[in-house]
């Protein structure tokens, strides 16, 4: 009887324990939900005075009004900024998450100059499986330490070493474009993107992947497939939960692509580490450095050498994060800027003639490589690129997740709000850019830039978290454009409304950039 009683008592205890555990778990969930609702109600009340684009409904906000298609969504946001241009800021609720849209220089300055508001939007978490917590996605003390460590790697004296790679790949591109001379219009977006990918691979990793020669290579295909999957996931809230995402084919493809990209980068790092060790062993044995076909250094070599203030080197994982980040950030943005430049030059022949004259003054009829001194002389081309990035900023909008309450334009904005900065709209403020839809590189002549608000133009962001690679990007854009425009005259008959602007992380033309090429000098072979 005793054993029976003990057994029954044990079962009761187990049942009681299970019930208690369920009760505790349920209470915890309810408590979390209650805390979220209280926080949501506080934000709703605190941000009520901020002008809203339309009536927002509790919990769903404006989500029911937002367009699901990326092209239509971007056009909708831009339409709001145009409609409410007279207001200092506007508010949207995407579900329970509040967003404030910033498109006036004085308000953008408040966020971008803050040393506290440096956290990227929660959307950037979808980049973390690929990029880890590198310079783009990290926050707080890790970001500050990493930024300080890497900034010297982007000094002009170091970037000059990358110019040979840019020239070589630009010449391959020019040779590829030859077949289109005096032919029908073609979409130049993809070949230019492959050129930018070749440049970033060789400068970041010291690896020539030959994307321009073989655009169907596994690495190239995986890079583009991964980027597309990330963009799609950002727009699909039902894919935001990792376990749920992996239940679908796209989630499994995403995981497979990650493994492929990380394996490629890991192998390149291992090769570079082994090569450096072999060379150091030779030097240590008194045999001198190993013979090498090239003395070029890649960004990877710099990462293998840098140390923090305490003399600590980056780990293998740290290095992979930064190489992958440089790869991701460094080709799409520059490729977009070059394509938009060609479109605008092809649509504005009077501007193109001025560029041609400057190129002739610097290079004559020579086909020699572009030098750093040449780039310094190409001042009008520099203005063309700046004006291109004003009209079509490569990154049309970006966001900060506010880490504390702040005040903008007299309105109190709650902690946790997504502050969405919209360069596409900011750059069209008629106070600083009259006739904003007109393509006028002269806006950026020194005498015409005086008095302009320093935050009226932010193609590379601004403040402490501005783009660390902007000098590299401009150098690449000028070099490739100089090589193309020395050889070809560009014609474009596309109208703006035919482009199909899509504003994901990068501003892209859904319908491509279609141009015609003519040889500039008919007597050239």
Curated annotation (Swiss-Prot):
Example GO molecular function: long-chain fatty acid omega-hydroxylase activity
Keywords noted in UniProt: Endoplasmic reticulum, Heme, Iron, Lipid metabolism, Membrane, Metal-binding, Monooxygenase, NADP, Oxidoreductase, Transmembrane, Transmembrane helix
Activity regulation, short description: Inhibited by N-hydroxy-N'-(4-n-butyl-2-methylphenyl formamidine)(HET0016) with an IC(50) of 38 nM.
SUPFAM superfamilies referenced in this protein's UniProt entry, alphabetically: Cytochrome P450 (SSF48264)
Cellular compartments annotated: Endoplasmic reticulum membrane
Spans through the membrane: 13-33
UniProt-listed CDD domains: CYP4V (cd20680)
UniProt xrefs under InterPro entries: Cyt_P450, Cyt_P450_CS, Cyt_P450_E_grp-I, Cyt_P450_sf, Cytochrome_P450_Monoox
Residues annotated for heme binding in this entry: 329, 467
Membrane topology designation: Single-pass membrane protein
Catalytic activities: dodecanoate + reduced [NADPH--hemoprotein reductase] + O2 = 12-hydroxydodecanoate + oxidized [NADPH--hemoprotein reductase] + H2O + H(+); tetradecanoate + reduced [NADPH--hemoprotein reductase] + O2 = 14-hydroxytetradecanoate + oxidized [NADPH--hemoprotein reductase] + H2O + H(+); hexadecanoate + reduced [NADPH--hemoprotein reductase] + O2 = 16-hydroxyhexadecanoate + oxidized [NADPH--hemoprotein reductase] + H2O + H(+); (5Z,8Z,11Z,14Z,17Z)-eicosapentaenoate + reduced [NADPH--hemoprotein reductase] + O2 = 20-hydroxy-(5Z,8Z,11Z,14Z,17Z)-eicosapentaenoate + oxidized [NADPH--hemoprotein reductase] + H2O + H(+)
Domain of life the protein comes from: Eukaryota
GO biological process: fatty acid omega-oxidation
Entry EC number(s): 1.14.14.79, 1.14.14.80
GO terms for cellular component: endoplasmic reticulum membrane
Free-text function comment from the UniProt entry: A cytochrome P450 monooxygenase involved in fatty acid metabolism in the eye. Catalyzes the omega-hydroxylation of polyunsaturated fatty acids (PUFAs) docosahexaenoate (DHA) and its precursor eicosapentaenoate (EPA), and may contribute to the homeostasis of these retinal PUFAs. Omega hydroxylates saturated fatty acids such as laurate, myristate and palmitate, the catalytic efficiency decreasing in the following order: myristate > laurate > palmitate (C14>C12>C16).
Name this polypeptide is given: Cytochrome P450 4V2
Gene (UniProt): Cyp4v2
């Amino acid at each position: 009887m005793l054993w029976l009683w003990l057994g029954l008592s044990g079962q009761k205890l187990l049942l009681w324990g299970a019930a208690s555990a369920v009760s505790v778990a349920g209470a915890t969930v309810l408590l979390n939900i209650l805390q979220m609702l209280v926080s949501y109600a506080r934000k709703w009340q605190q941000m009520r005075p901020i002008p809203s684009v339309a009536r927002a409904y509790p919990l769903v906000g404006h989500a029911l009004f937002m367009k699901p298609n990326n092209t239509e969504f971007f056009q909708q946001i831009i339409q709001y900024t145009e409609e409410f241009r007279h207001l200092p800021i506007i508010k949207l609720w995407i579900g329970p998450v509040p967003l404030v849209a910033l498109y006036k220089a004085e308000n953008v300055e408040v966020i971008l100059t803050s040393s506290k508001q440096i956290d990227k939007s929660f959307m950037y978490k979808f980049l973390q499986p690929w990029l880890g917590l590198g310079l783009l996605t990290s926050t707080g003390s890790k970001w500050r330490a990493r930024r300080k460590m890497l900034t010297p790697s982007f000094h002009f004296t170091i970037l000059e070493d990358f110019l040979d790679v840019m020239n070589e790949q630009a010449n391959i591109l020019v040779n590829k474009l030859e077949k289109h001379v005096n032919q029908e219009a073609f979409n130049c977006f993809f070949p230019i993107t492959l050129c930018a990918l070749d440049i970033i691979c060789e400068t970041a990793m010291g690896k020539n992947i030959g994307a321009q020669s073989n655009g169907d290579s596994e690495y190239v295909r995986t890079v583009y497939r991964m980027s597309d999957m990330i963009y799609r996931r950002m727009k699909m809230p039902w894919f935001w939960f990792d376990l749920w995402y992996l239940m679908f084919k796209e989630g499994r493809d995403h995981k497979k692509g990650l493994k492929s990209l990380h394996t490629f980068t890991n192998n390149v790092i291992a090769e570079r580490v082994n090569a450096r060790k072999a060379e150091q062993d030779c030097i240590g044995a008194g045999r001198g450095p190993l013979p090498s076909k090239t003395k070029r250094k890649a960004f990877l070599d710099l990462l293998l050498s840098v140390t923090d203030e305490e003399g600590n080197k980056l780990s293998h994982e740290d290095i992979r994060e930064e190489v992958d980040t440089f790869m991701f950030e460094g080709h799409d943005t520059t490729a977009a800027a070059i394509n938009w430049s060609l479109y605008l030059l092809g649509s504005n022949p009077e501007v193109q003639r001025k560029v041609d004259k400057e190129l002739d003054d610097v290079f004559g009829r020579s086909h020699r490589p572009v030098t750093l001194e040449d780039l310094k002389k190409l001042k009008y081309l520099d203005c063309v690129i700046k004006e291109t990035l004003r009209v079509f900023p490569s990154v049309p909008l970006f966001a900060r997740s506010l880490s504390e309450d702040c005040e903008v334009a007299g309105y109190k904005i709650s902690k946790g709000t997504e502050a969405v900065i919209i360069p596409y709209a900011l750059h069209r403020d008629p106070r600083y850019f009259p006739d904003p839809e007109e393509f006028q590189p002269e806006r950026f002549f020194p005498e015409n830039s005086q008095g302009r608000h320093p935050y009226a133009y932010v193609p590379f962001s601004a403040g402490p978290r501005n783009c660390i690679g902007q000098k590299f990007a401009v150098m690449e854009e000028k070099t490739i454009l100089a090589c193309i425009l020395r050889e070809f005259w560009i014609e474009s008959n596309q109208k703006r409304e035919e482009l199909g602007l899509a504003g994901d992380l990068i501003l892209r033309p859904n319908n491509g950039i279609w141009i015609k090429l003519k040889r500039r000098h008919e007597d050239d072979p």
